[in-house]
Amino acid sequence: VLFTPPELLGCGNRCSDDCCKWGRCQPGCTD
């Protein structure tokens, strides 16, 4: 089964990995 948990999806170029949680950029983070 090819299932990727949301926390492993990443945010692409929207923000840094440090600011990315559950595939979303967290508030208060710089891009």
Swiss-Prot record:
It is found in: Secreted. Keywords: Disulfide bond, Knottin, Secreted, Toxin. Its main location: secreted. One of its GO terms (cellular component) is extracellular region. GO terms for molecular function: toxin activity. The keyword Protein transport does not apply. Expressed by the venom duct. Disulfide bonds join 11-20, 15-25, 19-29. It comes from the Eukaryota. The presence of a 'disulfide through disulfide knot' structurally defines this protein as a knottin. This is Augerpeptide hhe6.3. It comes from Hastula hectica. The lineage of its organism: Eukaryota, Metazoa, Spiralia, Lophotrochozoa, Mollusca.
